[in-house]
Amino acid sequence: MPRPFSVALPPWLTHALRAQRGPVPWNAVLRGALAAGPLLLAAVLAGRESVGVMAALGAMLAGINDRPGSRRTAVHRIGVPGLAGATGLVVGTYAGEGLGAVPLTLILTALGLLAGAVSAVGPVSSGAGTQLLVAAAIGAGMPLPEPGWQRALFFLAGGAWLIVLRLALPTPGALAHDFRFDGERVAVADVYDAIAELLAAAGGEQAGARRAALTAALDHAQDALAGPRLRRYASSSAERRLRAQYAAALPLAEAATALAWAGDALPARTAKGPRRLAVAVRTGEPCGPLPAPARSVPGLRALDDALLHAAETFDRGGKQTGGRKPGSRQEIDGKKAGDEHGAALHSDTGTNPLDRGARQTAHKGLRLRPLRAKALLRTVTGPGGREYGFRVALCYGASAAVAQALHHVHWYWLPATAVFLVKPDLGPLVSRVLNRAAGTVLGALVFAGFAAVLPRPEGLVALVAISGALIPVATRHFAAQTAVVTVLVLALVMVGGEPEASWSRIGETLLACAIVLIVGHLPAPGQRGGNVRARLDAATDAAHAYLTHVLSGADDRAARWALRREAYRKLAEARAAIDRAAAELPTLARHTEGTGEVAATLERLVDTTTACAVHLDDTGRLTPRHTERLATLLDELVEQRERAGLADPPADLLSA
């Protein structure tokens, strides 16, 4: 029988065709519909179309940053880039009015260097850098009657309006509880679901993927609960309960990781306890009896102890119905109440290491240490920040120079487009160029068709509202997002009094794509792949700190869990950067060859360290399997880092 014909696509093309999956975020769709469109309508009715254009632009860019998560996190994720965008508008407007083409290009290039370097810090900083540069180009080139400070205020008002909608509108089904924390509640419940999925996958081929999914769920919940607040500690019982439930998930995640590392399949009942806890988080009801695993190996004993601790935590914070506490020791399904080890563990819940660590984590915070100014400065000025800043500055400045040389009325489109193309943390360069070109052509053609038949300005306002509603769905693929944003921006341009510009928009975008492709592949000073190398070094340091703590025999569970979370978070960031770099064209991808193997070894090292921690808690000593595995992984790490051209790992890591 002939084999089916298949074609292996290159990584850069595979990435360009890949789209995110998931349910439609209807609450974000509603916010998008109520954001830019109504603001523009109010301005049109008041006869201030230019004001409406600025406010709608602020709301549109805020909508791109309106992602799932808690309300507090949304304020930070939307507000910080909005402030950066307002700053860019002020700088761009006054620079465009008072400077010639050459000094203006130099100013924009310097802004690109700064914004690119800052973008290496993280997603929020990257969003701020993007809005700073886009708004600076718009301020310098878009002809509007308002002075720079007024443009900035109206731009901020658009973003602030979306924040108000994010804070005020409850998500579906959230009114049954304190809807202020619906995002946190979903995030914590997802952690327990991810633990159950990992336990169910133990011993199978999907265990590695499930462990990565657990890391993502823990990162998301940690960010949701550690969002910006006016007070240092949780101020409401609902928030304190969620923080305690998150802290109770950490020993469960640790035990599940150790069991997955062991490689043995587990009975189906092992995953039922975390699933019931996930339901309890979502509903606010007691968790009920939890099936207890057989206490036959250290990992299962750790899982059992963590389940008992979680049940007690949920009982203290959940709704009580009288009588025996659901989930208490007497009702643990299949558990003998006389188990000596468990009785000793829970005889004094205030002094055992597990309970003490959970209380410290829930009370003092979920991060190992807050970001300090020196650490941020090191990231910005380090190899990753320098490479990022140089690449963005070169493409942004070159686009601005070419655009002004062409004397096009919409010259600001060229540098603004380059910003969305060149930022490495947003995706591979060639993938974004292909999607940007395709999305712009599609969006411009769609808008040209609507502009020919819609009444003005009411039809254009409706088009802005519909496009705003589609942004949360379109963000799953860059081409779709580009098409929707193109329609929205072209509608705003016409409402502002300029002629229909679909065809010039296509030409400007294709020119920007060509500039970025050429400039982005030019030789750069220093070693390429600096962002990947910097993140791998950070992951290596975090893995080293975690391994050192575990092997020291310290009994501080809160510190151990924080170090473990830090190690897995840094590894996830490094893995994401490596995957993006691998999807570049071969001329760029070759600079990070071998880094994927280093990340995989570090992941196995952290998994093994977790298994060692669980075993040391149970027996106080490691087995030959643990020590031999650690030695093998450390030797592999040295060899792989050498092949990838990375610096040697810390000497004390190798001597561990």
Protein language model features and the residues they cover:
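Cytosolic regulatory and coupling regions of membrane transport/channel systems
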Residues: 1-30, 34-37, 162, 166-409, ...
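Alpha-helical transmembrane segments and their membrane-interface boundaries
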Residues: 1-132, 136-163, 296-325, 329, ...
